[in-house]
Amino acid sequence: MIPTEDASARKREIEEKLKQEQETLSFIRESLEKSDQLTKGMVSILSSFESRLMQLENSIIPVHKQTENLQRLQENVDKTLSNMDHVISYYHVAKDTDKIIREGPAGRLYEYLACIAKIQKAVEYFQDNNPDSPELNTVKARFEKGKELLEAEFRSLLTRYSKPVPPVLILDAIGGDEDMEVQEEVTLEHLPEAVLQDIICISAWLVEYGRNQDFMNVYFQVRSSQLDRSIKGLKEHFRKNSATSAIHSPAVQTKRKETPTKKAPKRPVYIPGTIRKAQNLLKQYSQHGLDGKKGSNLTPLEGFEHDLRGVKHLSDEKHGATAGKDDVLDIEIDSYIHCISAFVKLAQSEYALLTEIIPEHHQKKTFDSLIQEALDNLMLEGDNIVSAARRAIMRHDYSAVLTIFPILRHLKQTKPDFDATLQGTAASTKNKLPALITSMETIGAKALEEFADSIKNDPDKEYNMPKDGTVHELTSNAILFLQQLLDFQETAGAMLASQVLGDTYNIPLDPRESSSSASSYSSEFSRKLLSTYIYKVLGNLQLNLSNKAKVYEDPALRAIFLHNNYNYILKSLEKSELIQLVAVTVKKVESSYRELIEQEIQNYQRSWLRVTEHLAERNIPDFQPGAKLKDKERQIIKDKFKGFNDGLEELCKIQKGWAVPDKEQRDTIRHAQKRVVSLTYKAFLQRCANISFTKNPEKYHRYSPEQVEDMIDRLFDTSA
């Protein structure tokens, strides 16, 4: 059982908690009553506010709607007035723009274009809203007038500011200073920048609103004229400077540039001196070879210390008469080569300018028309060169082909740039340069073939043969012609390849090359073809010289003649690069000529047999020293002395006037002859030393061995 005290305490505790809970409950009940009262008050206030708000809305909304309507009406009135003003302005456009249109766009292009824009809008308005109004005709006429003045301004700006490019600037553009390690790109400015921007602006307007292409015709006509004038100015520059060597071009100072492995130089390269020399000499032979003159026109090679005996060079008078023409020819060729490069550079510059002014879909056609005049003039000049060469070749003047070589080489070097520049033009335009190249290759190959045939078939003329047996002019001119080919090896080889395809010379094509076009044969094949051609010319020359030598009645002179010519050919081949070029296909050409030279020396030495045979031991009886000779035996010895003396004197007299220009060969021949004759003569004298065959020995023993050697030393020397 729970103790009584604890129960009482517990009871009191519970009663106290109950009392507290009752007090809390009473507080909550009072709070709820107050909250209900506040809620009822708030609901009453909100209900009153809503009622008043509805009353206010009912009074304000009608006023708002009325105000909104009034504002809309005001806006409509303003828009109507604005539109009326705008429409009325169209009726005044003609009057407002009259002064500016009449004065034209010069000096105020953008203001003028703004006026044109106003007129155009007026035209569009009347066309859409009142097509029958007289105002439409007025603004239309004003618009057409404005467009005409814009086109006139376009023409005026182009004409006024388009100037030919100065020749010096063109030469800088196509070549630059080759002495400079870093070449700066030369920019050709055809129009001032401000003028160019005006022209571009006018062009853009005419394209968009002008609705015609007349301005494009104007553009190509004006620029075409300036392009042609620029090229003609370059030609005139060369002509004016032809009297000096200081032309702004490296052509006259440049050494040979083209080899089969070297890259072509950037600036056109031409070697006037070699062409002029070759043409001078070859023309003299081809045109005056039948006038009775003889000898070679070629300057002696190293080792030929005397002028070739019997050679008649061009007289000063004759040379002076032709020198001017040769200089003109040099300038014309150099000029044409540079004009081709100038055309490409100027055409590239013109196209760059054109792309800023002419619409893209009209650019190629306009460019095609723009370049036609200058291109046609260049092609016509090239055709004239070909025609002149063709006429010269018909006259057997094969030196004319030397004019074609530098031009053809440059045309082929320029062709890639030419094709790239003319990309997109008409086929007839793009084919003009290839057609000229083909024409030059055809006439050049024909000239080379006919030259080879002419060497073989050159007639044997006694009066045209050198009396002293020196180098024949056919030899010197043939070698000179071949030496000129060294400057144009790739060009000449490709020229032959493009025409004969190797069949003429039995050179097989590489299978990889057989499908290529004629203009794309490998450099190696062209070099082989040229090597074979040169060997063919040398073979024809050798055959012709053998035939010509038969004109000489004296076998010794015949041998000297062939010796001189063969030696000259060999020396020329060795001095130039011809020997290496021929060796491409024929390895033993040098040894062949040395054998021929040695053979002719031996043939010449046989002429001395009629001298030394008198000293031969046959028919000479055995003599005993101090023995008395019979009359017949004495006469034999006398006849041998007399035969030797007369033969020696006769040969020395005749052969003294002959020529062996090569000092080394001359000394070799003399030395060999001295050795043979002197030994034979000394042996004969020694045998007859103690024999008394005459009372006057000095009558028969005229020359000592030393004197004989001295006489032989004076052979081939007219001054001795």
Swiss-Prot record:
<keyword id="KW-0653">Protein transport</keyword>
<dbReference type="GO" id="GO:0090543">
    <property type="term" value="C:Flemming body"/>
</dbReference>
<dbReference type="GO" id="GO:0000145">
    <property type="term" value="C:exocyst"/>
</dbReference>
<feature type="coiled-coil region">
    <location>
        <begin position="63"/>
        <end position="83"/>
    </location>
</feature>
<dbReference type="GO" id="GO:0005829">
    <property type="term" value="C:cytosol"/>
</dbReference>
<keyword id="KW-1003">Cell membrane</keyword>
<feature type="modified residue" description="Phosphoserine">
    <location>
        <position position="133"/>
    </location>
</feature>
<dbReference type="GO" id="GO:0005886">
    <property type="term" value="C:plasma membrane"/>
</dbReference>
<protein>
    <recommendedName>
        <fullName>Exocyst complex component 7</fullName>
    </recommendedName>
</protein>
<dbReference type="InterPro" id="IPR046364">
    <property type="entry name" value="Exo70_C"/>
</dbReference>
<feature type="coiled-coil region">
    <location>
        <begin position="5"/>
        <end position="34"/>
    </location>
</feature>
<dbReference type="GO" id="GO:0015031">
    <property type="term" value="P:protein transport"/>
</dbReference>
<keyword id="KW-0472">Membrane</keyword>
<dbReference type="Pfam" id="PF20669">
    <property type="entry name" value="Exo70_N"/>
</dbReference>
<comment type="function">
    <text>Component of the exocyst complex involved in the docking of exocytic vesicles with fusion sites on the plasma membrane. It is required for neuron survival and plays an essential role in telencephalon development.</text>
</comment>
<keyword id="KW-0813">Transport</keyword>
<dbReference type="InterPro" id="IPR016159">
    <property type="entry name" value="Cullin_repeat-like_dom_sf"/>
</dbReference>
<dbReference type="GO" id="GO:0005546">
    <property type="term" value="F:phosphatidylinositol-4,5-bisphosphate binding"/>
</dbReference>
<dbReference type="Pfam" id="PF03081">
    <property type="entry name" value="Exo70_C"/>
</dbReference>
<keyword id="KW-0268">Exocytosis</keyword>
<comment type="similarity">
    <text>Belongs to the EXO70 family.</text>
</comment>
<dbReference type="GO" id="GO:0006887">
    <property type="term" value="P:exocytosis"/>
</dbReference>
<keyword id="KW-0963">Cytoplasm</keyword>
<keyword id="KW-0597">Phosphoprotein</keyword>
<feature type="region of interest" description="Disordered">
    <location>
        <begin position="249"/>
        <end position="268"/>
    </location>
</feature>
<keyword id="KW-0175">Coiled coil</keyword>
<dbReference type="InterPro" id="IPR004140">
    <property type="entry name" value="Exo70"/>
</dbReference>
